[in-house]
Amino acid sequence: MLLSSIYKLLGQNQPAEYELDISGLNSLKKAGVHELSYCDGEANVKDLKSSNAGAILVCQEHANLVKNHAIISKNPHLDFANISAFF
C-alpha cells in the first residue's frame, strides 16, 4: 500500500510528494523501512528515535522524534487498527 493511500484512508492530505510502498505493519522495535508502526504513549516514545519504520503514526507532540516519516494522528492506536484491515 502506498503512503499516499494511507493518508487517504485517514482523510488527510499528504504533506509532501514523498512516496513509499508500505508492505506491512510492525512494532516500533521490529519495523523495517517498508513497514508502518505507531506510537501511542509515553512508554513507547523512547523507541521512536531508533525505529527503522518507514512511517510512524504519532501525535504532533512526538513527530519531531521520528527519523523517517511521521504521520500525525490524534489517535495513533486507533488509526493503526483501522489501517491494519487493509493488510
Predicted segments, located by residue:
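Terminal amphipathic alpha-helical/low-complexity segments used for targeting or macromolecular assembly
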Residues: 1-87
